[in-house]
Every structure is written in structure tokens, then in C-alpha cells.
Amino acid sequence: MVHAADLMERYITEIAGMLRAGMIVLCDRYIYTALARGYARGLEIKDLRHFYDQYFPVPDMAFYFRLPVEAGMKRAAGRSELKHYEAGMDMQFSENILHNFHAFQTRVVDAYDSLAESENMYILDAMKPVYETTPEMRRMVGEYFQKKYGMELISGL
């Protein structure tokens, strides 16, 4: 419920007004993060989906930057500390925070992989450098706008 409350606050204070005004909203985390983390904590995606669909609109596009768990472990090792819930320590897979992080993040990645098959998610390789993924994203967004609105994006944006 903590994740739902956090998402609701973010939606009310940052997202809903912009959507009502007809703006395009870009988020770095939204309902798919809540679904994946809820699944990793033992809840069923369909039950989570039923709950979140009542309160939050489904995004038109979502980018899933797929990162293997081991690569995520290496990135996390560079931080000064792992956050308790991000490491899944509340799940107590292991007393060792790194083992726990690995087990929890494996479940999160499994959830995202499952969601990517059934949702409007565009999968990008998070192992690639930003200068390679940025043009891919621009192309995908451009194709979406062309298809949905008959508009081309301005080059260079």
C-alpha cells in the first residue's frame, strides 16, 4: 500500500492536472513499476492491475529499459547503500542484503518481462549507452505520433 499511496500522491500533484490540460506527460516510473514491485512482493499481477486500473490511466507508451539482474547488481554496488525496500529486505529472502537484492530484483525483472508481453511497452536494452538508446526512443515516439495523430516530430528534439 505504501507504493500505491506514493503513486497516488505523485499522480494527483504532478500528473493529473497536466493530463486534464491536454499535455504530454513523461514519467520515469508509473504503474508498471508498482505492478512489478507488487508482484515481486508476492501479489498477483491481475489483482494489482484491477486495483491500479481503477485510479490511474494506462499510458499510451511505456519504455522498459531491460537490464539483466547481474548488471543491476554491479550498478547497485557503486552506490553508498541500497534502499531497504528497493533491496526487498522486507521480503527477507536472505539475511545478506546483496543476496536479498538479487532475489527481489529477479522477481521484479520477471514481472516486467511478463508485462512487456501484454502491455504497450517498448523494450530497450539498458546495457547500451544512452547515445544509442536515445535515437531508438525518438524513432518509436515519432512512429507513435505519426500513427496516432498523423504528426511528425520536429527533427532534433
Task: Indicate where each model-derived feature is located.
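The start of beta-strands in P-loop NTPase/AAA+ ATPase cores
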Residues: 23-24, 61, 120
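Conserved phosphate-donor/acceptor-positioning beta-strand/loop module used by diverse small-molecule
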Residues: 28-29, 55-78
